[in-house]
Structures are given as C-alpha cells and as structure tokens.
Design a protein with these regions (language model features):
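Hydrophobic single-pass membrane-targeting/anchoring helices
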Residues: 1-55
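Solvent-exposed, non-transmembrane segments of extracytoplasmic/periplasmic domains
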Residues: 54-232
Length: 232
C-alpha cells in the first residue's frame, strides 16, 4: 500500500461506510472509589503528561482501569489527556475498546493521526487456530496494522517477538519501531506493540498500543500496559 491507503485510524472508520453494521461496544470502566475512612492508598504510577489536543470523550472521574468485556481482559487507564476510543471499528477486531489522543490533525491522506491503546476480540482471518497459534496470529495482525495505519514507505525494526504469560494465560508479544520520511507528517516514526492472549474463548484478545515519535516520552506506557493486563 502507498500513501493513498486509508489514513491512520481515521475518525469514524470511514472504510466501514456502505452498509456495515457497527457493533455496539459496551466498555465497562472501573472507577476508583475512595473510602470514607482512611483514604490514603498507594498513589498510582503517573505517566508523563499528554500535550493538549482536540478533546474527545472523557472517562469518568476516578477511572483506573479499562475493562473490555467483549475481549475478556482489562488494562490500565493511562490518565488525563487520554480519551475513550470512539472512532469506529477496526478490521483486526470484532469490537474496539480503549483510549486515544490526537497527535496531528489533518494528515495528507485525510483524518487525524493518533496515539492509541485499544483492545478487542480478534476477528477472523488472522490465523487463529486455538492454543499454540498466538505467535502466528499476532504476526499477521502486526503486518495488518503496519499496512493500514502508517505512512508508506516505512522501515520496520522488530524490538521484541516473544511468548508471554499474561495473568496465567498464554500470550505472544510483537513490538516494533517504524520509521518514515513522508511529507505532511509531523512524526517520522512510531513505536507499536501488539499482544495476543488466549483468554479461553473462541476468539483471543488483542491489545494494541501505538505511540508516534512526536510523543516518544510516552513509549514507557507500552511496558506499563503489557505488565498489567488482567484476564477476566
């Protein structure tokens, strides 16, 4: 695919226009409830602040985790400046839950460029054949997102390609760095990570984190999210 391919996570997922039925994603958000007595708990780890961008749908005050009931997992809410993902479906998953913020408005191919941390049950067509196929599935998904959501041409450097255990479940992680030099984009690269988890359901869960290098100070959220995924 060349520069005319669909823009990076375009608002409202324009490729689904034309009769596709959007799934209604029920995202259950866990709120931190402060007790009436002795409210001094251990403070949450704070990530670097996110530069102000166009506002999206804010999470309820006190949110600490995002619970994706459809995928069967939960993971950390990354804090102020991250908004509820409401930009439409992605073809890699049956439904989408998660968080994002805009890093550049009006990229050359249309739509906006974003940082995101999203999840969902993996859709058909990505090689899932049950337990033991985590690596094949996440590899196919990594190729899919590279082709669909980033400027071309680009170069990919694989940083990690390894089996994991996530909350007792078999999983596989692929993390990579993309670089490009494409006119009209403020970023010249991106760090992305995908984790496929066998959650004991017909479809495995996908967690997808992607941060443009204009916000490289946030690369650490990848390790934070991967280390704190829970299986429901």
């Amino acid at each position: 695919p060349g520069p005319s391919s669909p823009p990076r996570r375009r608002a409202r997922a324009a490729w689904w226009v034309g009769g596709a039925v959007l799934a209604v994603v029920a995202v259950v958000v866990v709120a931190l409830v402060v007790g009436l007595s002795g409210g001094g708990g251990t403070p949450a780890v704070e990530d670097p602040p996110v530069a102000a961008g166009p506002p999206g749908t804010e999470f309820p005050p006190g949110t600490v985790r995002i619970v994706d009931e459809e995928a069967g997992i939960s993971y950390p809410f990354l804090g102020n400046g991250w908004f509820e993902y409401d930009l439409g479906l992605m073809p890699e998953t049956r439904t989408v839950a998660g968080q994002y913020f805009t890093t550049q408005e009006g990229v050359p191919t249309g739509g906006d460029f974003i940082a995101q941390c999203t999840s969902g049950p993996v859709a058909d067509g990505y090689g899932w054949a049950g337990p033991g196929s985590e690596q094949a599935t996440v590899t196919a998904l990594a190729d899919s997102v590279r082709a669909a959501y980033y400027p071309f041409p680009n170069e990919r450097q694989v940083l990690r390609d390894e089996a994991l255990t996530v909350d007792g479940a078999a999983a596989h992680l692929v993390e990579f760095q993309l670089t490009w030099d494409v006119e009209g984009y403020e970023s010249t690269g991106e760090r992305a990570a995908l984790v496929v988890i066998d959650v004991g359901r017909p479809d495995p869960a996908l967690v997808y984190v992607s941060i443009p290098n204009t916000h490289a100070e946030l690369y650490g959220v990848i390790d934070r999210v991967v280390a704190d995924i829970a299986v429901l």
